[in-house]
């Protein structure tokens, strides 16, 4: 009898080991470099640094300890450092130079980072606006020159004692040799103590033009997918203007964007706590970077489940790649009713009417969704809706503009949306224009922001997604922007002039020939320069706005396109790839960086076409997914494996109630039938809109529009005059039912199609038909029975309009 052997196919992944950084140069006797022994097997990485066996081919050139820290030996040269772990090995070459050269710690590059790491110059300590106990440092060491003067020349020289460094207050207090309100921060046996002590012993050398300046940071690993519960060491290396590099890991400030997924300690050791992704943010010497660390969800998903996902465009490809890495399975595609309602709301801010729904549900053509999207993007309501959105962004209201200026600004925005003006042209039309605000509505942007500081901060947040306000007073604590960059940027707008026009309420915008804004500490103007760009001479007669507009709309300025792409994505998908949608700082990375980069690239390559961007997103399967969770994605509200439910905005909700009931909302001073989304001004009184979060348009901040639930909202919905009056309106839809003599079944179909974009279920229909049938049994006159029937219909419509299915976009 033959023996049968069954072979089970199991995916085998060859484990690979690498040493990071892949190349190392040690410069000077104090150079150190933490190495990582990092393995890769399949989709996962693993940190073997603490258990690996480390060896050097020549310890006299460079030695490596059991922790993987390599340091110079007795002479210069090259050496091979090897790590062995789990039966495999990896080797890198380390170059050593100036191993025995004289060395002095730098105040800028060593002492200041030590003070920052210890928290001495934090906002809670001596970096506070008023300092602590008469000792004030600049926040996180943003101005080393000022800090040097404070340490060495103030307090009668007691903070730094050149005669006996150990008696320096800067050592005595943080080491707790004498009482210190901040506690023990600086153990005497620490490297940090030695850095400060040896710097003082060397004569406390000041800052010098010969000091190497930091040019950038590298992080290792830049990204890693780890197993649940795993740990990972992060290593940060700084590069300097003289070409040398330094391991600055121990002086970096670390934080995690999602501590439910991963936490990080003071020394860069990451611990995985849950499933998903976390950005480990690194702050060092006014520079920020992050490492993306992830752990997949604990789901076993077969490959065919991903293969069945219908990919329509690059959005689906990149979303699918993210889900695979995180072990998330997408929800199915939403049914036609859900998609139809969602598309109408997201593209045009309205509900489909009952005829729209019936026609769409009856349509059997395979491309009906694509055709619907195309039709929606050509409707007047699309123009109303997106004009309203951009008016929110640009703060159009009579709060700060007169009525004429408000209307001309709004009409300019609406005309731009109607003609699908490219976004780069939209920006140029604002920043490059001069003349009368009556004749050119875009110029009212400068009337709104007459103050140079306000104009600078609004422009950077509206068009670049950068909140630079902190840098007005000091280097940004959470971003790379410095105070110097802030005032260089502000000086681009210092010569924007505003004067009265020839007609009442008119203003004229012009470029002044002179005028600068002063750096508050330096007490002098700085050469104007966009963020991270070259400056222009202070004495140049060129309109500085030209330089700004050219830089702003350049395809190489990724912040510009990235910001508006993320805003549009957030509007359609309920959450930005970067969230909040207007906070695109480096320490707030996208949930799918590859997808955002691809959207930005596609947007730029197709001429900054907003309508095309919306069409691209809405045509993706990703946009059309159901919001109903499956067994893998119930907890996902970040990676779009299911559609994210959102409450209707105040204006959309009010207009939808008016649409379903056939009773338009009256707005004082506006023609009958004006919808909330057609109002150019948020100062138009409406308690309902105010209660549901209509923004006052004071600040350029996505948080101005609130979606938080309140008691006031509940009262408006449950028993408010706004809805009750619409239900009982004598010329509304419910009154029309009686006049037309529609059957109960047809009435139910109509109200469900109008409110929910679907037919009632059998259970809903049976319950409501029974309720309507009871009205026929009311004793008394025919009029009493008609009144009872009308009241029953009002109650049914009220029940539909106060239900979550109506109040939310699914």
Question: Where do the protein language model's features map onto the residues?
Answer:
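Proline/serine/threonine-rich low-complexity linkers at boundaries of modular beta-sandwich domains
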Residues: 13-17, 205-216
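Globin-like tetrapyrrole-binding proteins
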Residues: 796
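Short, well-ordered beta-strand segments
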Residues: 46-59, 195-203, 246, 250-260, ...
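Periplasmic/extracellular electron-transfer cofactor-ligation site
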Residues: 116-138, 198, 202-210, 467-482, ...
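Short solvent-exposed capping/turn motifs at the termini of beta-strands
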Residues: 39-43, 238-242
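Sec-dependent N-terminal signal peptides
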Residues: 3-12
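Solvent-exposed helix-loop boundary motif
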Residues: 23-30, 58-103, 108, 112-117, ...
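Primarily short, surface-exposed interaction patches in extracytoplasmic proteins
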Residues: 307-668, 699-700, 704, 724-792, ...
């Amino acid at each position: 009898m033959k023996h049968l052997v069954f072979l089970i196919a199991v995916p085998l992944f060859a484990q690979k080991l690498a040493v990071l950084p892949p190349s190392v140069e040690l410069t000077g006797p104090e150079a150190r470099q933490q190495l990582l022994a990092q393995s890769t097997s399949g989709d996962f990485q693993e940190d073997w640094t603490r258990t690996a066996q480390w060896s050097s081919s020549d310890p006299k050139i460079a030695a490596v300890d059991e922790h993987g820290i390599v340091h110079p030996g007795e002479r210069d040269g090259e050496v091979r450092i090897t790590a062995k772990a789990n039966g495999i090995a990896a080797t890198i070459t380390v170059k050593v130079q100036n191993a025995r050269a004289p060395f002095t710690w730098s105040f800028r590059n060593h002492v200041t980072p030590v003070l920052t790491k210890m928290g001495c110059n934090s906002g809670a300590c001596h970096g506070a606006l008023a300092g602590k106990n008469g000792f004030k440092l600049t926040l996180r060491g943003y101005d080393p020159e000022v800090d040097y003067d404070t340490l060495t020349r103030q307090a009668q020289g007691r903070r730094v004692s050149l005669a006996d460094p150990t008696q320096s207050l800067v050592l005595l207090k943080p080491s707790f040799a004498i009482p210190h309100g901040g506690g023990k921060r600086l153990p005497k046996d620490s490297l940090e103590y030695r850095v400060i002590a040896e710097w003082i012993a060397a004569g406390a050398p000041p800052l010098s033009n010969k000091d190497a300046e930091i040019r950038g940071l590298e992080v290792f690993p830049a990204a890693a997918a780890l197993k649940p519960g795993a740990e990972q060491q992060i290593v940060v290396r700084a590069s300097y203007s003289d070409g040398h590099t330094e391991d600055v890991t121990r002086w970096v400030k670390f934080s995690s964007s999602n501590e439910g997924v991963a936490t990080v300690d003071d020394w860069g050791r990451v611990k995985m706590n849950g499933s998903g992704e976390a950005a480990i943010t690194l702050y060092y010497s006014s520079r920020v970077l992050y490492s993306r660390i992830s752990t997949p969800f604990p789901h076993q998903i077969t490959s065919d489940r991903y293969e069945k996902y219908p990919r329509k465009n690059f959005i689906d490809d990149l979303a699918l790649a993210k889900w695979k890495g995180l072990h998330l399975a997408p929800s199915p595609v939403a049914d036609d009713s859900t998609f139809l309602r969602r598309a109408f709301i997201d593209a045009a801010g309205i509900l489909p009417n009952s005829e729209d729904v019936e026609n769409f549900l009856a349509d059997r053509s395979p491309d009906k969704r694509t055709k619907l999207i195309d039709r929606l993007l050509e409707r007047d309501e699309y123009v109303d809706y997106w004009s309203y959105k951009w008016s929110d962004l640009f703060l159009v209201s009579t709060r700060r503009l007169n009525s004429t200026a408000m209307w001309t600004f709004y009409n300019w925005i609406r005309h731009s949306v109607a003609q699908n003006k490219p976004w780069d042209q939209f920006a140029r039309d604002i920043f490059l224009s001069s003349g009368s605000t009556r004749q050119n509505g875009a110029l009212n942007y400068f009337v709104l922001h007459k103050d140079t500081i306000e104009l600078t901060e609004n422009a950077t947040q509206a068009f670049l997604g950068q909140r630079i306000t902190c840098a007005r007073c000091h280097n940004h604590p959470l971003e790379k922007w410095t105070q110097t960059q802030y005032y260089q940027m502000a000086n681009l707008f210092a010569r924007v002039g505003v004067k009265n026009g020839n007609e009442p309420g008119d203003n004229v915008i012009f470029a002044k020939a002179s005028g600068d804004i002063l750096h508050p500490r330096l007490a002098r103007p700085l050469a104007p320069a966009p963020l991270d760009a070259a400056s222009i001479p202070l004495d140049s007669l060129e309109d500085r706005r030209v330089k700004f507009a050219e830089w702003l709309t350049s395809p190489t300025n990724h912040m510009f396109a990235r910001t508006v792409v993320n805003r549009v994505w957030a509007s359609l998908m309920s959450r930005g790839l970067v969230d909040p949608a207007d906070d695109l700082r480096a320490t707030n990375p996208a949930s799918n960086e590859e997808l955002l980069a691809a959207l930005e690239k596609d947007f730029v390559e197709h001429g900054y076409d907003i309508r095309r961007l919306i069409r691209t997103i809405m045509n993706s399967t990703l946009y059309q997914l159901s919001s109903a969770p499956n067994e893998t994605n119930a907890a996902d509200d970040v990676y779009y494996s299911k559609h994210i439910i959102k409450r209707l905005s105040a204006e959309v909700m009010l207009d939808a109630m008016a649409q379903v009931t056939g009773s338009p909302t009256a707005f004082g001073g506006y023609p009958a039938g004006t919808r909330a989304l057609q109002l150019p001004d948020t100062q138009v009184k409406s308690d309902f809109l105010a209660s549901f979060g209509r923004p006052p348009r004071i600040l350029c901040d996505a948080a101005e529009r609130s979606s938080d639930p309140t008691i006031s909202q509940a009262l408006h919905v449950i028993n408010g005059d706004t809805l009750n009056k619409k239900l009982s309106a004598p010329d509304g839809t419910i009154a029309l039912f009686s006049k037309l003599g529609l059957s109960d079944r047809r009435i139910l179909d109509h109200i469900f199609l109008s409110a929910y974009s679907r037919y009632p279920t059998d259970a809903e229909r049976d319950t409501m038909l029974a309720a309507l049938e009871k009205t026929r049994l009311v004793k008394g006159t025919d009029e009493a029975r008609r009144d009872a029937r009308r009241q029953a219909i009002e109650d049914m419509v009220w029940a539909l309009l106060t239900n979550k299915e109506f109040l939310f976009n699914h």
